[in-house]
Structures are given as structure tokens and as C-alpha cells.
Amino acid sequence: MMTLRDLINKLLGRETSSANTARERLQLVLAHDRVDMSSLTTDLLDKMRKEILDVVAKYVEIDFEEVAVSLETEDRMTALVANLPIKRTISGEIKFKKTDKANKDIKK
């Protein structure tokens, strides 16, 4: 894919710099990565969800009715987001810290 800058450089007889070549290669890699994300089928996501839940369930009791696993894309980055409400640890009560907006630790 030739950019306008590449076309002007070619018409003026300038050689392509290694920076331009590297930039073009990086753009191809990024485009390839984006295409690969589209290959995540519903079946594959379901398998990933099941495996994640199986691993987490070894250590904590999960509220399976409230579990949500999704793919979210923002600014060319795709993230697998898993919201797993935890009832308690397998050995007993769950212990955790919450941090409020003023960065003060609140223990529950």
C-alpha cells in the first residue's frame, strides 16, 4: 500500500528510508493482529469462558448466575473482560481491601 508521501518521494526520485519501511511493516503486523481477533468464534469464547471459570472455581466460590465474559475493543486494543462475582474462598470467608477515590484503604 503506497501512501501519498511514498508517491511523492518516488516521483522526486527519493529512496524509501528504513523508518518508512519499518512503519509499513508495523502497520501490516497491526492489521494482521486485528484480523486475527475476528477469528475468535463464539465456540472459542465459550471454551475460554469455561476454562477460566474452572480454574477460578478451584480457589473461590463464584456466583455463576452473575458471571459475564466479553471482548471489548477500545483504541485499537481488544481485551477479554471477565466479571466473576466471588461469594467466598473455598476455605472460608473472603478477605479483601477496597480503595476509595481518595486512595484510603477500607477493609471489609
Curated annotation (Swiss-Prot):
Keywords: Cell cycle, Cell division. This is Cell division topological specificity factor. InterPro entries: MinE (IPR005527), MinE_sf (IPR036707). It comes from Prochlorococcus marinus (strain MIT 9215). Belongs to the MinE family. Prevents the cell division inhibition by proteins MinC and MinD at internal division sites while permitting inhibition at polar sites. This ensures cell division at the proper site by restricting the formation of a division septum at the midpoint of the long axis of the cell. Signal peptide: none annotated. Disulfide bonds: none annotated. One of its GO terms (biological process) is regulation of division septum assembly.
